[in-house]
C-alpha cells in the first residue's frame, strides 16, 4: 500500500500504449459482464476474475482453492489468483484495439493540442480522424524529383494518346454521319429527318470531346497534385486519391483515421519544428507570431518532458477496475450497472467486429466505417458528448463517461476527495440551553451513548463491570444504569465539535464540553447563536467527536467556544448578548426620570442595603439614589471626586465613594469584572457592544467568558422580571398624522393641476410627488417618535436595539409611505395607512411586489454568495503564514486621524478596518522621542495614544508589500483578528480571508440601482459589484481616466462626444469617446493629472494598473470592495481583501525573454520570474522583462502551479489535459492538494514543525528528579543471593499478578 507521507510531489503525464499494457493484468476480449444464471463473472469479460482478481476473499473461480493458506497461488484450472477481493478495486485490464484511435481530449479540447503540434486546423483534423479525408504521411521527395522528367514524359504520352483516341473517334463518327446522310438523301428523306440525324451526331461528337477533355483535365489535376504533394496534405476527394495512388503510389504514403496521425507523429521532428517556430517568433509579426508562440508552447512541452506525442494516439484502451464500475442486483432480480460498462461494451463489440472484418478481408469502405465507429465508441468512453450527440442510455439520458466521473460537484474530485463522510458523527434539532456555560452544550443521552460507545465499553471493562468488550457491548445495548454513570465519567472534559450548515466561516464549527440532557434535542448556548447564525425554528446541527489526544487538545485549545469570542473578519466580539438579554439589561439600567418611581433621592450605605429596600418594595430599580460603593470599586470614567471638607484626606483611587445612580445600574456593575470602571449610563445594544469590545481588548479570555455568562443570566432574568409585552394598544398612532397628511395632499393636488395644465412634464410630476410624499412620511415618523412614551414596550425594544428599527415602527404606527413597482421605479402614490390602521385593497396589492422580491432576491443571493466564497477560497488557499519576518522595509502609509473643521484631531472612520491590528513598519518619533517603536501591534490603546500625540498617519506592514517567497510572513500580516495576538506560523490566513469576505456576501443586495435623475444610468452595486472587482472585469459604463497630465478639450458632434487630453510634455493627444448621457467631471480647458477620472462611473482596474501602476490598483480595489461592504454596514478588515488582491497580482506577463528560459507572452509566477532573472544576471546574460498582470480570481485559481488544485476547481478536463502534456509536478504546497491525496494539510498543527515534536526534560528537570530520590530510598536487591541458574520464563513464579 502506498503511504502518502513518503512522497513529496505528484506528477501527471501522458500514458503510452506500453504503459497501459504494463498496468494491465490481462486483456478483456468479450463484452459480457456476468452470467445471469450463476451470477458469476464471465471469463475474459468485463468482470473476469482471472484478470481483475477473485470476487470472494481467498477463493478462486472454480472453488478448487479456498482459505487463506493458499494465498498467492494461481489456480491451474481457472487461472485466478487466490488473494483478497479488494484487489478488484485496483487491478486494471486493457482492450487491444484492431486500429489505433486518437484520444479525444487532445484532439477536441480547446485549443486542440494535436492541431497545434501538427499545425492542422481542428476541422481538417476531424476529417482525417473520422475517415472523411486522406492524409499524406510520407513523400519520397528525392525519388520524385529524380523521376519527374520521365514521369512528365509518360504523362504527356498519355495525354497525347487520349487526344489521338479522341481525334480518331471523332473522325470515325464524322464519316458515319456522311454515310448516313448520303443514304437518307438517296432515299429522298425530308430535310427535317436529315437535320435530326445531324444534330444527334453532333451531340455524340460533343460528348466524345467532353469526355476526352475531362480525362485530360483529370490527368492534369492528378499530375499537378502529385508534383506539389507534401507531407500532411489532405485529400478529401476519394477518387482523385485513388487515381494518385494507382499512378504514383510508390512515391508517397497516405492513409485515413488515427493511423495516419500515428504515422505522422512517429516521423515528426520536434527539435526542427521548435527551431522553425523560434525563427518565426523572432522575425514574424501579428497573427503569425501569436500562433507560433502558442504552437511553441505545445512543442516545447513535449521536448522538455519525457512525454511522447505518440501518447495522443492509442493502440489499446485501459479498463478500470471492476469495483469502480460495479454491477449490483436489485430486488426484482434485475441489475443496475455503471454507465461505464455500457460504454466499454460498445468499444469491445465494435473492436471485435473490426477484427473479424479485417480477418475476412472486407472491402475498405466497410472497414473504414467500422474504424470510424470504433473511434466514436472510444471518444464516448473518454468524454461522452464532447463531439456530436452523446450516447444515451434508457430514457434518453446521456451516459456518464470517464471525464464525467471527474467533473463537477458530483465528480471524483469534489464529491469523494475533497468532501468525505466521517464516522463518529450525529445530527439533531437544536434548542436553547440558557442554563449552560459559554463552553458547554447539551447532548441527548442516547446520542452521547452512541457517540462515545467505544470509550464507554473500554471503561466498563476497566472497572470490571464487564469481562470483555463483547459483554460490555451487550450492557450498552441493553441500557443498564451503570452504563450512564460510566458515560458521565467518560464525557467529562472530552470536547465535541458542533457544526451548523452552511459553514460560512470558521466559527461555523466550534468545540464544546458536552453535558448530558434528557430528550432528543441538542442544547446550545444562546450567545453562540450569532456565530453559527442559528435560531431555534427547527435548525439542525451536526456533532463530531475528536478521538485522538491531539485532536482533543486542538479542539479544547483552538476551537472551544470561549476561546472564539472574536470574529476573524474584523477582530471584534461576535459573542454578544442579543434580543431578550439586551432588553433585560436595558430595563435594568434605564433611568426612572420620566416615571413615577418609588424611593427617589434616598441614600444607602451599600448596595446590599439598597437591595434590601428593593426586596421590601420600598425602592424601584430605576430610582435615582445615592449609594456608597466599597473599597476597590473604580468610579465611572470622567468622575470627579466631590469637594472635600476641611481636615478630610484627599480622595485616592480605591477609596470608597458615593455616587448618584440607580440600583439597577449598581446590579449591572456587579456582573462586570471588579476592576472595570463603573458604568453609569443606559445600556442598550450599542453600549453593550462597546463594553464587550473593551473587555475583549483588555481582559483574559476566562474573565471575558465568565462576564458574558453573567450578562446572559442577568439579561434573561430581568427581561422576564420587566414584564415587557406587546399589545395592540401599545401601537400609538400620532394624533397629528391626519393634519400632516391633509397638508401634503393639498400639495399633491397642486402638482397634479400643474401637470394637467401642461406646465410640467410627466417625469417632473413623478419626481415632485415622490419628494412631497417622502417628506410627508418623514414628518409622520417624527411625530410618531415624539408621541411614543419612553416606557412603551415596543419603543423600548427598538430603543434598546433588542429588535426592530424605526423604519419598521414607522410602518406599524405611522404610514408605510412609497413603494416600488416591478420595474424598480417608485410609485408616486404613497400608502397612507399604517399596519395598525389597516391597508386598503389597492394599498395591500401594490405593497406585495416588494415583499415577494425580497424573498426571491435572498434565494438568489445565497447561491451567488456561496459561489463567490468558493472562488475566493480557491484563489487564496495556499496563503499560509510561513515565517516570522520576511525582513522587508516596505510598508503602507495609512491615515489614522484627520482634523475636523474645529481643528481638533479625530480618529478616521475606517481606522477599525485599515490600521487596527497591523504592525508598525517604523518607529513613530515626535520631537526626537520614540512614542511607538517599530514592529509593535497597533491596538485600540496605542492608536488612541498616537492620536493624542497629534500623529495623523503611520507606516504599517502589509501583505501587499510582503517579500516572502511562499505564503506570507507573520509581521506583514500582523495581529490574528480571531485571537487578538500576533498570528501564529502555519495559520491559513488565505482561507480566513476568503471566509471573511464571502460570509457577509448574503447580506449584500443583488439589484443594480438606477441613480436618481439619469434614467438608464445603471450602477452595479452589492454582490455583483464585488464579483466584478474580484474577477477584474471591465465594469459596465466604465469611466475613462487620463493617461497623462495635460489640458482638457471637449468635442461634441450631433452623434458623438469625446474628451481630448493634450499632454503637457507635447506628446500625442489622447481622445476618449464617451456616451452623450455620461456626466463629465472635467470642464473645457481644465488641467488634469495622470489617472484623474474624466466622467462619473467605475474605473477599469486594468487601466489603473497600466497607467498608475501596481500600488494604485491595489488601493483602488481595496477601496472599492470596502465601499460595497460599508454601504451594508458590514465590517471587514482590509488585510483580508489585500490577501485576495495579492493573489490576483501574483503573475507577470513576459514581454521580452532575453536570455531567460521564458517565452514572450507567457504568464509566470512573480517568484519564478525573479529567480530566473537572478540566475541569468549572475551568468552575465540579459534578463527578461515583464509587466504585472491583474487576473480575476477564477483565472488566477486555474493558473495555479498546482494541477491538483486547479483540476478540482473548474474545467477539470482542460486542466488535466494541459497538465499531462506538460508532465506537471505538483509539489503539494497548498491545502487542497494535500486534502486530495489524504495527507495532513501544511497549515496549523499539520506543519512538520508542530508535528515532529518530542518532549525532552531539561537538565535542571533531570537533576531535580534525581535529587528528589535519595540513595537509601531505592530498593536494590542484594547481590549474590540468587542461585545463578537460568529459569525458563514459563516456570517463573510471578506471584499473584499471573492469575
UniProtKB/Swiss-Prot annotation:
One of its GO terms (biological process) is DNA-templated transcription. It comes from the Bacteria. Gene3D superfamilies: 1.10.132.30, 1.10.150.390, 1.10.1790.20, 1.10.40.90, 2.40.40.20, 2.40.50.100, RNA polymerase II, clamp domain (4.10.860.120), RNA polymerase Rpb1, domain 3 (1.10.274.100). Pfam families: RNA_pol_Rpb1_1, RNA_pol_Rpb1_2, RNA_pol_Rpb1_3, RNA_pol_Rpb1_4, RNA_pol_Rpb1_5. The keyword GTP-binding does not apply. InterPro entries: DNA-dir_RpoC_beta_prime, DNA-dir_RpoC_beta_prime_bact, RNA_pol_asu, RNA_pol_N, RNA_pol_Rpb1_1, RNA_pol_Rpb1_3, RNA_pol_Rpb1_3_sf, RNA_pol_Rpb1_4. Zn(2+) 1 binds at residues 60, 62, 75, 78. Binds 1 Mg(2+) ion per subunit. Mg(2+) binds at residues 535, 537, 539. One of its GO terms (molecular function) is DNA binding. Zn(2+) 2 binds at residues 886, 962, 969, 972. CDD domains: RNAP_beta'_C, RNAP_beta'_N. Its EC number is 2.7.7.6. NCBIfam families: PRK14906.1, rpoC_TIGR. Belongs to the RNA polymerase beta' chain family. DNA-dependent RNA polymerase catalyzes the transcription of DNA into RNA using the four ribonucleoside triphosphates as substrates. This is DNA-directed RNA polymerase subunit beta'. It comes from Streptomyces avermitilis (strain ATCC 31267 / DSM 46492 / JCM 5070 / NBRC 14893 / NCIMB 12804 / NRRL 8165 / MA-4680). The lineage of its organism: Bacteria, Bacillati, Actinomycetota, Actinomycetes, Kitasatosporales. The gene is rpoC.
